[in-house]
């Protein structure tokens, strides 16, 4: 029990970022899945970290730009790096480009989300009539 308490007490800021990180793929989910997921993460954590490797970098940049251009997010930090990825356990490591984009909520984020929810409700009630 003491080990768990010690681990919790020693949590650093990078550990808390793991909870609000979205690893974006350019093949697994549609673009707006990530846009909507990022909005939910920002509601919950006030910021979201989008990360991608290789070909998915264009997708993560597009997601960030959609959120910024629609007034939901502001850019806090962008980090680029190269990571070694192995396709096979004994294979050679291959360098892959990686990007991490940290986005924070804008001041009017909550108003925009409320307006979006209201528009969705209005659209649902119109379809039912």
Describe each PLM feature range:
Residues 48-52:
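Short glycine-rich phosphate-binding loop at a beta-alpha junction
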Residues 1-45, 58-129:
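Long, charged, low-complexity intrinsically disordered regions
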Residues 54-56:
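Short, internal active-site loops enriched in acidic
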């Amino acid at each position: 029990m003491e080990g768990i308490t010690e681990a919790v007490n020693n949590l650093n800021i990078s550990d808390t970022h793991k909870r609000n990180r979205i690893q974006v793929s350019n093949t697994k989910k549609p673009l707006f899945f990530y846009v909507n997921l990022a909005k939910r993460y920002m509601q919950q954590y006030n910021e979201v970290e989008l990360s991608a490797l290789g070909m998915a970098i264009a997708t993560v940049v597009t997601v960030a730009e959609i959120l910024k251009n629609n007034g939901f997010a502001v850019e806090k930090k962008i980090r680029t790096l190269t990571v070694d990825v192995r396709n096979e356990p004994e294979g050679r490591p291959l360098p892959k480009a990686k990007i991490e984009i940290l986005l924070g909520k804008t001041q009017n984020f909550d108003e925009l989300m409320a307006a979006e929810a209201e528009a969705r409700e209005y659209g649902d009630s119109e379809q039912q009539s």
